[in-house]
């Protein structure tokens, strides 16, 4: 499912992500846009054999279990397939854990290259 920006915003607010670790909503929205184009079913395979899943491209090496990534930590204690359904609540809970451990959005390559320090006005909720 391709989410509309407003749907994503509503979900982010509901999960208490506005201001979490000092991260503003436009930063979350920008990250989701550049990671997946707001597509809840997005997957991308990495050269290390891991896969990124869902609207925020959560990685199977560390955060979710897909049954095929060697040495997966599954720190969010979730099946990666749950990150591909239309309900993004679990994606956001896991993303919150990731951002909490990193104290920000640095684990997301798209945020570092396309959102950090950029004009985020088009990603306002």
UniProtKB/Swiss-Prot annotation:
Q: How does it assemble?
A: Monomer.
Q: Which reaction does it catalyse?
A: Hydrolysis of (1->4)-beta-linkages between N-acetylmuramic acid and N-acetyl-D-glucosamine residues in a peptidoglycan and between N-acetyl-D-glucosamine residues in chitodextrins
Keywords linked to the UniProt accession: Antimicrobial, Bacteriolytic enzyme, Disulfide bond, Glycosidase, Hydrolase, Milk protein, Secreted
Annotated organism of origin: Tachyglossus aculeatus aculeatus
Which pairs of positions does the record mark as disulfide bonds?
9-125, 30-115, 64-80, 76-94
The top EC class, named as a word, is hydrolase
CDD domains of this UniProt entry?
Answer: LYZ_C (cd16897)
The active site of this protein is located at: 35, 52
What EC number(s) is this enzyme filed under?
3.2.1.17
Q: Has keyword Electron transport?
A: no
Q: What else is known?
A: Lysozyme C is capable of both hydrolysis and transglycosylation; it also shows a slight esterase activity. It acts rapidly on both peptide-substituted and unsubstituted peptidoglycan, and slowly on chitin oligosaccharides.
One GO term (biological process) = killing of cells of another organism
Task: Report the main location listed first in the record.
Answer: secreted
Span of domain C-type lysozyme: 1-125
This chain's function reads: Lysozymes have primarily a bacteriolytic function; those in tissues and body fluids are associated with the monocyte-macrophage system and enhance the activity of immunoagents.
Q: Key word Disulfide bond present in the record?
A: yes
A GO MF annotation of the entry reads: lysozyme activity
Compartments reported by the entry: Secreted
InterPro entries to which the protein is assigned, alphabetical: Glyco_hydro_22, Glyco_hydro_22_CS, Glyco_hydro_22_lys, Lysozyme-like_dom_sf
Q: Which GO terms describe its cellular component?
A: extracellular region
Q: Which family does it belong to?
A: Belongs to the glycosyl hydrolase 22 family.
- Look up the domain of life of the source: Eukaryota
Q: What protein am I looking at?
A: Lysozyme C I
């Amino acid at each position: 499912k391709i989410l509309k920006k407003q749907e994503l915003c509503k979900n982010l607010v509901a999960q208490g992500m506005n201001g979490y670790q000092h991260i503003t909503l436009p930063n979350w929205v920008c990250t989701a846009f550049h990671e997946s184009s707001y597509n809840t079913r997005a997957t991308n395979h990495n050269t290390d054999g891991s896969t990124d899943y869902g609207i925020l491209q959560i990685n199977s090496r560390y955060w979710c279990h897909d049954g095929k990534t060697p040495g997966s930590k599954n720190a969010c204690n979730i099946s990666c397939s749950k990150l591909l359904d239309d309900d993004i609540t679990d994606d956001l809970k896991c993303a919150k854990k990731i951002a909490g451990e990193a104290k920000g959005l640095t684990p997301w390559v798209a945020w570092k290259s396309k959102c950090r320090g950029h004009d985020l006005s088009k990603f306002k909720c």
